[in-house]
Amino acid sequence: MTKDNKTFEDRLDRLKAIVSALEKGDLPLEEGVALFKEGQTLSKECATQLEKARNEVKIVTGGEVEDFDVDTEEDTADDS
């Protein structure tokens, strides 16, 4: 975890809540600006965490990072 003990998922959940609140459009200006700033910070922190994870995967895989397929329920249903 990071120094403030928030996980990537914690940050992402908060970012989703901020986006939802901003999309409603009924916030006072000051609150909207504060949430926007918080969202920008969270977005940068998430991007940093993702890049760090990607680099760790590169190290583990010897520099090879490939996209992978995630089976969804629809995909597995089509395969049967």
UniProtKB/Swiss-Prot annotation:
The keyword Nucleotide-binding does not apply. GO terms for molecular function: exodeoxyribonuclease VII activity. It holds the Pfam family Exonuc_VII_S. Keywords: Cytoplasm, Exonuclease, Hydrolase, Nuclease. InterPro entries: Exonuc_VII_S, Exonuc_VII_ssu_sf. It is found in: Cytoplasm. Bidirectionally degrades single-stranded DNA into large acid-insoluble oligonucleotides, which are then degraded further into small acid-soluble oligonucleotides. Heterooligomer composed of large and small subunits. This is Exodeoxyribonuclease 7 small subunit. It comes from Maridesulfovibrio salexigens (strain ATCC 14822 / DSM 2638 / NCIMB 8403 / VKM B-1763). The lineage of its organism: Bacteria, Pseudomonadati, Thermodesulfobacteriota, Desulfovibrionia, Desulfovibrionales. The gene is xseB.
